[in-house]
Curated annotation (Swiss-Prot):
Organism, as annotated: Lama vicugna (Vicugna)
Self-association and partners: Heterotetramer of two alpha chains and two beta chains.
Disulphide bonds in the chain: none
Protein name: Hemoglobin subunit alpha
Single annotated GO MF: oxygen binding
């Protein structure tokens, strides 16, 4: 559960991420594909090379979804319901991959905002991404 301080940290972080969410999403995907090559199996039709238009487009989807989630911290299940259905029923993504992408997102945000990525912000963003992952995998059962 996100505390009021966690929510404030997430809102502040996404305020700084601002218009870079799509770029950070793409960068995090690239990090994930390089660091965890088995994740590439979900994207056999993608050009996974650095800077690929397909990775950038999917990074935008990731960034947009996280921005929407950050705007709806008190009702993540409703905000992410369609995305949860998609990942559970159509794409059938292994839930462990959300944890891997979350890690890569944290690394990406830390790399771009080292002065703002305090231990408290790190913990709050980690909790937020864990909550998002939990919602996205909630319909697998």
């Amino acid at each position: 559960v996100l505390s009021s301080k966690d929510k404030a940290n997430v809102k502040t972080a996404f305020g700084k991420i601002g218009g870079h969410a799509a770029d950070y999403g793409a960068e995090a995907l690239e990090r994930m594909f390089l660091g965890f090559p088995t994740t590439k199996t979900y994207f056999p039709h993608f050009d996974l090379s650095h800077g690929s238009a397909q990775v950038k487009a999917h990074g935008k989807k990731v960034g947009d979804a996280l921005t929407k989630a950050a705007d709806h911290l008190d009702d993540l299940p409703s905000a992410l319901s369609a995305l949860s259905d998609l990942h559970a029923h159509k794409l059938r993504v292994d839930p462990v991959n959300f944890k891997l992408l979350s890690h890569c997102l944290l690394v990406t945000v830390a790399a771009h905002h080292p002065g703002d990525f305090t231990p408290a912000v790190h913990a709050s963003l980690d909790k937020f991404l864990t909550n998002v992952s939990t919602v996205l995998t909630s319909k697998y059962r």
